[in-house]
């Protein structure tokens, strides 16, 4: 799930005063600087483009390129927006009937909006906020109370309350010291561990701290945290729910780099921990505006077209280049050609797409060492208000929505994070005369993948009642289950070096996706950032790609002439 540091005009620094829940993470915006030349990939540009928030690119002055993008998820669309802004021609090919990828949604026959997961926008999603502002979607986010809320069995509430008159890092320090989610001893040990982390260095040397964080990729967060004095209880009651919400795996199995990246951002950016959620469904309020921006500028979407084969050749001098893509839609087949090809896939998708021969390159072979994490998203519609804990009578009326309006964490259920979308994203999810729409993310999803939907729904219902005893007696009037076999890539210790760069050994073939190399974690922000990096590489190779286009035209012409001569001779 998702989701940056920000130059945002999206919302005020503090949310409106209404105590409610949250969860969070993300990176601070970098100081703006002028990007390097557009047609030359200089070391300066490469260095800058690896930042969490790259500077704005200069206006591209190279040749206009035709670019084909495989995948219309957030990474593919981010790439398309950047390329169209630089004057290129862009086509996006998506095998599904809807766009958005892991942040997509669709409407079923009964008019219900079905999401691929629960999407939360951390205050450090600078690149995503930049994209949303560019496409006119920045007003589609609702700011939540600046607290992260933990719902424990029996309906007791624990909080990390970041509301404080003074910003980072003091607002975070007081939140951790005052939290009622941990006992005094665990809070003290938690404070010691964080004091011994790169978080402290980040206050005076953010770049140095991030490098120190990168160097901790080989160790799990649990091992690192406990080696610094943290307790197992802190992990179980606080950090595991947060970690499951972010990457769908627990602290024992996640790289310390991932968690410490988030901590570093929280320590240096007041808004990093401030959560936002969409007004309604992603298809309407996120993907929709991006799609309109793309099509208004001449970009084209081709839905239900899947790429079956990457057609490539190797020149006598050993250089490999793509000559086209074989696409299919039902019984139709088509070969499309472009100057540059972008694979904006998830981990299982890129593994299926890459020609097996390309594994001779270490960069491509390393991709096969990555795998995705299974996740199950459940939606439950009730005939009352599940998260209303104060007033039983209010929880039974259906005239107005009541309850906790935020992202919620729990350590006491198989779903680590959840939200009542009828409250938190009401535009599409509040229905007059109906109650809560609980959307819960089951992590780890492995035990639930083989189960029938009815059994999954039954298990989740029981756990909801354990968290909210006051909801006993409410009925589920509608439900849905979405299973994704491989979602975010598994950010296990030692996996970061296997993430590929967006530029590949194949001259006109590029990668985009949140799993690719960038300084943020696999998330909506990571996907958006990868698209910016991909576009920068393509623009930097503009003259080279033009030369390749001319070479291929000559080669095709010579082959066609040769075929004619053969026919004439026969």
From Swiss-Prot:
> Which cofactor is recorded for it?
NAD(+); NADP(+); FAD
What keyword terms does UniProt attach to this protein? Carotenoid biosynthesis, Chloroplast, Chromoplast, FAD, Flavoprotein, NAD, Oxidoreductase, Plastid, Transit peptide
The entry's function note states: Catalyzes the conversion of zeta-carotene to lycopene via the intermediary of neurosporene.
- Compartments, record wording: Plastid, Chloroplast; Plastid, Chromoplast
Output the Gene Ontology cellular-component terms: chloroplast; chromoplast
Claim: Lipid biosynthesis is one of the keywords in the record: no
Q: Tell me if Chloroplast is a UniProt keyword of this record.
A: yes
The record ties this protein, via InterPro entries, to: Amino_oxidase (IPR002937), FAD/NAD-bd_sf (IPR036188), Zeta_caro_desat (IPR014103), Zeta_carotene_desat/Oxidored (IPR050464)
E.C. designation(s): 1.3.5.6
One GO BP: carotenoid biosynthetic process
Q: What name has this protein been given in UniProt?
A: Zeta-carotene desaturase, chloroplastic/chromoplastic
Chief localization: plastid
Q: Where is this region: Disordered?
A: 1-33
- Family to which this protein belongs: Belongs to the zeta carotene desaturase family.
Q: Which gene carries the instructions for this protein?
A: ZDS1
**GO MF terms, alphabetically ordered:** 9,9'-di-cis-zeta-carotene desaturase activity; flavin adenine dinucleotide binding; oxidoreductase activity
Which classification does the entry list for the species? Eukaryota, Viridiplantae, Streptophyta, Embryophyta, Tracheophyta
One matching Pfam family is Amino_oxidase
- Pathway it acts in? Carotenoid biosynthesis; lycopene biosynthesis
Q: What class of enzyme is it?
A: oxidoreductase
């Amino acid at each position: 799930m998702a989701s940056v540091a920000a130059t945002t005009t999206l919302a005020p620094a503090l949310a409106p005063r209404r105590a409610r829940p949250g969860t969070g993470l993300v990176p601070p915006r970098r100081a703006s600087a002028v990007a390097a030349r557009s047609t030359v990939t200089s070391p300066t540009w490469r260095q800058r483009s690896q930042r969490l928030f790259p500077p704005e690119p200069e206006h591209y002055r190279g040749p206009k390129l035709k670019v084909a993008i495989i995948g219309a998820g957030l990474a593919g669309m981010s790439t398309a927006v950047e390329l169209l802004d630089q004057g290129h021609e862009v086509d996006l090919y998506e095998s599904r009937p809807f766009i958005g990828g892991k942040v997509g949604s669709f409407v079923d026959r009964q008019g219900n909006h079905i999401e691929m997961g629960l999407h939360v926008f951390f205050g450090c999603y600078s690149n995503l906020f930049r994209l949303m502002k560019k496409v006119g979607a920045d007003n589609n986010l609702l700011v939540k109370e600046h607290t992260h809320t933990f719902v424990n069995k029996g309906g007791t509430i624990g909080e990390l309350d970041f509301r404080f008159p003074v910003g980072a890092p003091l607002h975070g320090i007081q939140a951790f010291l005052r939290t009622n989610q941990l006992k005094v001893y665990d809070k003290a040990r938690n404070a010691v561990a964080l004091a011994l982390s790169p978080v402290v260095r980040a206050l005076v040397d953010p770049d140095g701290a991030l490098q120190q964080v990168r160097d901790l990729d080989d160790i799990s967060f649990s091992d690192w945290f406990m080696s610094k004095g943290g307790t197992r209880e802190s992990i179980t009651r606080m950090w595991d729910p947060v970690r499951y919400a972010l990457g769908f795996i627990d602290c024992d199995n996640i790289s310390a780099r991932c968690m410490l990246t988030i901590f570093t951002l929280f320590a240096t950016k007041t808004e990093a921990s401030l959560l936002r959620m969409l007004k309604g469904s992603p298809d309407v309020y996120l993907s929709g505006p991006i799609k309109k921006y793309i099509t208004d500028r001449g970009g084209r979407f081709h839905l239900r077209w899947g790429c079956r084969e990457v057609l490539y050749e190797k020149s006598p001098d050993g250089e490999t280049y793509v000559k086209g893509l074989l696409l299919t839609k039902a019984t139709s087949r088509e070969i499309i050609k472009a100057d540059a090809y972008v694979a904006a896939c998830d981990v299982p998708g890129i593994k299926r797409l890459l020609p097996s021969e390309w594994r001779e390159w270490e960069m491509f072979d390393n991709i096969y060492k990555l795998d995705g994490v299974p996740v199950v998203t459940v939606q439950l519609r009730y005939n009352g208000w599940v998260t209303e804990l104060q007033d039983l009578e209010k929880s039974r009326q259906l005239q107005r929505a009541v309850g906790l309006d935020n992202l919620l964490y729990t350590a006491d259920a198989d779903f680590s994070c959840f939200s009542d979308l009828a409250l938190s994203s009401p535009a599409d999810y509040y229905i007059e005369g109906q109650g809560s729409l609980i959307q819960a993310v089951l992590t780890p999803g492995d035990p639930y993948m083989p189960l029938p939907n009815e059994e999954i729904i039954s298990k989740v219902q029981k756990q909801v009642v354990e968290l909210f005893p006051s909801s006993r007696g409410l009925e589920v009037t509608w439900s849905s289950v979405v299973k994704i076999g491989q979602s975010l890539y598994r950010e296990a210790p030692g996996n970061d070096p296997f993430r590929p760069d967006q530029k590949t050994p194949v001259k006109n073939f590029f990668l985009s996706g949140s799993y690719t190399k960038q300084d943020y974690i696999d998330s909506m922000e990571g996907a958006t950032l990868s698209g910016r990096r991909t576009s920068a590489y393509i623009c930097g190779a503009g003259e080279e790609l033009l030369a390749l286009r001319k070479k291929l035209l000559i080669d095709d012409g010579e082959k066609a002439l040769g075929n004619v001569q053969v026919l004439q001779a026969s």
